[in-house]
């Protein structure tokens, strides 16, 4: 399973639906995170200036045994195409941002479902991890 930044942030901020994302993580055979998404999570959490939540990211990555995947050339090309098709400036309802495009690309490249929060990826046709449970 590929995990998008949005799902990790929901868990670490203990949002209302955090349990659904935490359960999905716990039940997955493998949890993959793009290196770009790892950085994006860090940027989002570090902007809160709370060292506890900042450390919680690395603790989650370690405890849940995430595989942090480097961005390959193929994924970069898939992400570029995703931005052209589904990006914020494309007029498409998905409105994917930079990090979203890299999560999408990793899911397409690995042919694995994507765990995300929100409605953006639902407009792209990528397989949703929560639908598999």
From Swiss-Prot:
Signal peptide: none annotated. The keyword Nuclease applies. GO terms for molecular function: magnesium ion binding; RNA endonuclease activity. It holds the Pfam family PIN. Belongs to the PINc/VapC protein family. PANTHER family: RIBONUCLEASE VAPC2. Toxic component of a type II toxin-antitoxin (TA) system. An RNase. Upon expression in M.smegmatis inhibits colony formation. Its toxic effect is neutralized by coexpression with cognate antitoxin VapB28. This is Ribonuclease VapC28. It comes from Mycobacterium tuberculosis (strain ATCC 25618 / H37Rv).
């Amino acid at each position: 399973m590929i995990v998008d930044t949005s799902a990790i942030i929901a868990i670490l901020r203990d949002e209302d639906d955090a349990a659904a994302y935490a359960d999905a993580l716990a039940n997955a055979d493998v949890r993959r995170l793009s290196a770009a998404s790892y950085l994006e999570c860090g940027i989002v959490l570090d902007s809160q200036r709370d060292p506890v939540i900042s450390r919680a990211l690395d603790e989650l990555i370690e405890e849940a045994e995430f595989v942090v995947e480097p961005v390959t050339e193929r994924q970069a090309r898939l992400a570029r195409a995703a931005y052209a098709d589904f990006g914020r400036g494309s007029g498409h309802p998905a409105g994917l941002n930079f990090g979203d495009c890299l999560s999408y690309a990793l899911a397409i490249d690995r042919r694995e479902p994507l765990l995300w929060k929100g409605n953006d990826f639902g407009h792209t046709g990528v397989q949703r991890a929560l639908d598999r449970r």
